């Protein structure tokens, strides 16, 4: 269930506004909920929160080879717009990474408290929570299985288990990226389908 916020600020999308701690959005959104497949009209109370700390997941698929749920997160936006004293326009265009996560029950991916810096390959404290672009955090948050350039908007994820493609594609993931709108001053990216190999 996607979060209805960029960074859980006291004043949403307001320059310099601090993050709410703990973030109340995580009680009902920003995560994956599990419901019974044989019952209609279920409420939150009837579901189980499977994982948390995910800003907005659109692409997800069950990997039958590893018997695990994988998700593609749409990362946060506007680092420079909201924190111009910390992030340059170029940094804002390149951060944070879009991430592929392998989930287990109870997994925490860290949003809104952290974001993943795909250039440094580190979990960083979000500026809403005292981050300065250098401070690492998220000790209890899981690492992404893979990361991709910022703002590419991964909207589809499919593990290939068929027999039509060459064997090198077997059990790998196809990821459909919607494409970016906010990578200025850099060129926009995305608008493609990528293949992510999986060894095991």
Can you annotate each of these PLM segments?
Residues 2:
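A conserved catalytic-loop motif detector
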Residues 5-45, 54-56, 61-200:
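Beta-propeller domain segments
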């Amino acid at each position: 269930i996607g979060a209805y916020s960029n960074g859980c600020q006291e004043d949403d999308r307001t320059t310099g506004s601090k993050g709410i701690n703990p973030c109340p959005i995580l009680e009902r959104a920003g995560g994956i909920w599990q419901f019974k497949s044989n019952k209609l009209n279920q409420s939150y109370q009837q579901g189980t929160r499977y994982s948390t700390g995910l800003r907005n997941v659109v692409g997800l698929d069950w990997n039958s080879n590893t018997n695990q749920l994988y998700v593609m997160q749409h990362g946060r936006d506007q680092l420079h717009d909201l924190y111009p004293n910390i992030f340059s326009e170029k940094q804002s265009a390149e951060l944070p990474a879009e991430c592929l996560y392998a989930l287990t029950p109870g997994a925490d991916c860290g949003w809104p408290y952290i974001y993943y810096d795909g250039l440094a390959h580190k979990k960083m404290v979000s500026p809403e929570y005292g981050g300065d672009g250098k401070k690492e955090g998220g000790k209890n948050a899981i690492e992404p299985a893979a990361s991709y350039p910022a703002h590419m908007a991964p909207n589809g994820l499919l593990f290939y288990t068929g027999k039509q493609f060459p064997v090198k594609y077997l059990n790998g993931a196809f990821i459909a990226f919607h494409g970016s709108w906010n990578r200025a001053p850099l060129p926009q990216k995305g608008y493609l389908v990528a293949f992510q190999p999986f060894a095991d």
